[in-house]
Amino acid sequence: MLARGILRPALARAELGRAFSCSAQWQQAAGSTSGRELSWPDFFALRKTERRINTGSSVLTAFLTANCAWAYISTVQIDVTQMLFGFDPMVVLVGALFASSGLGYLCGPLMGSAFFRVKHRGQLEGYNHKNRVFLEHIKKNRVDASSQSFSNPLPDYYGEKIGSLQEYRQWLRDCQSHRRKAKEFL
């Protein structure tokens, strides 16, 4: 009787574990089929769109922050005989203008990716899944960075320039060629 009581909770946990894992598998299968599955050409087109939106928003935010900085700098009264941080005041103000536009350029992808998410809300789940799968392929197939040299440079290490299936296949061939050259010459 005591043995049955001890074994029974273990069996119950095993059954419960199977029940939850089975339902999780069904939920994953149902979740992946409920949304529209994104094809690889569609994924690469969306990836290119996201990159263009991010670049455009970077340029726009750099322009806006430079204009805001210019509006502030144009109202500042400076004394040309006084040094700012050990430099001429005009050099410091121009440096501040460039720094503000650089900061705006760096903040641009935040706005661009938010705009991309809103614009492509329906395809976002499939896009994120394909992006994870694509980045796993990149990690698995990229070459070792320690074997690079001037005569044998690395192919695109992060896969940022891959924009189609043909370019992906070419990237795989380039990685294989790099591995072969690194093995032959070392």
From Swiss-Prot:
Membrane topology: Multi-pass membrane protein
GO biological process, one term: protein import into mitochondrial matrix
Keywords: Membrane, Mitochondrion, Mitochondrion inner membrane, Protein transport, Transit peptide, Translocation, Transmembrane, Transmembrane helix, Transport
Cysteine pairs bridged by disulfides in the record: none
InterPro entries listed in its UniProt record: Pam17
Transmembrane segments: 58-78, 93-115
Subcellular localization, as worded in the UniProt entry: Mitochondrion inner membrane
A Pfam match: Pam17
Chief location category: mitochondrion
Span of chain positions assigned to the transit peptide in the UniProt entry: 1-27
A cellular component term, taken from the record's GO annotations: PAM complex, Tim23 associated import motor
Reported function: Component of the PAM complex, a complex required for the translocation of transit peptide-containing proteins from the inner membrane into the mitochondrial matrix in an ATP-dependent manner.
Family membership noted in the UniProt record: Belongs to the PAM17 family.
PANTHER family, alphabetized: PRESEQUENCE TRANSLOCATED-ASSOCIATED MOTOR SUBUNIT PAM17, MITOCHONDRIAL (PTHR28021:SF1)
Description of how the protein assembles with itself and partners: Component of the PAM complex, at least composed of mtHsp70 (SSC1), MGE1, TIM44, PAM16, PAM17 and PAM18.
Protein name from the UniProt record: Presequence translocated-associated motor subunit PAM17, mitochondrial
Originating species: Eremothecium gossypii (strain ATCC 10895 / CBS 109.51 / FGSC 9923 / NRRL Y-1056)
